[in-house]
Amino acid sequence: DAATQKHITDSAKLKTELAQILKDILNDGSDSKLQVYGLPAVIMVIGVNGVGKTTTIGKIANMYKKQGKNVVIAAADTFRAAAIEQLEVWSERAGVKLIKQQEGADPAAVIYDSINACKGKYVDVLLCDTAGRLHNKKNLMEELKKIYRILDRELPRGSKEILLVLDATTGQNAVQQAKEFKEAADITGIVLTKLDGTAKGGIVFSIKNEY
């Protein structure tokens, strides 16, 4: 309808118009930028194993580091083998501090230690990794709720973003993942990964419409 009203017939202009319409649907008139204020601002990253949470955290850490911000990463996925080691690599690349414990430690304890490491140190952003064991759904969801309660209690004034990471190639499975994680966390944004292939991430419109 918009194309007809504007008398758009050129395919390139039509593509641009369509892209803007889709962007408007996702933005919904709100600011799509991450809200980062308070010392520290918290960005909690959630999602099932294998979707790219660790890589996402590394990229966000690198982005804020390049902006001159002081960043700390909390390695709270203590269950997946090599999760902590992968974050060590990313934190070294970005030049940011990593707070960790041994594999199998209480994730909430890692978050608590990370908060204490930030207090009084002028840390701008605390990035929190989390586990993604959806096959153990009940324990995972309770764990996420516990982590958020600690963040809310210890850092009441700072901004808190909860980003759900979804693999763009998974289609309808991503909708189900969004539903299940929304039961445990107040998701503020979605990160789509693996868009370098044929997947274009159209599933976000279904998620936006439903949730």
Language-model segments: which ranges?
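Short glycine-rich anion-binding loops that position phosphate/pyrophosphate groups of nucleotides
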Residues: 131-133
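Conserved catalytic-core segment of NTP-binding enzymes
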Residues: 106-121, 135-211
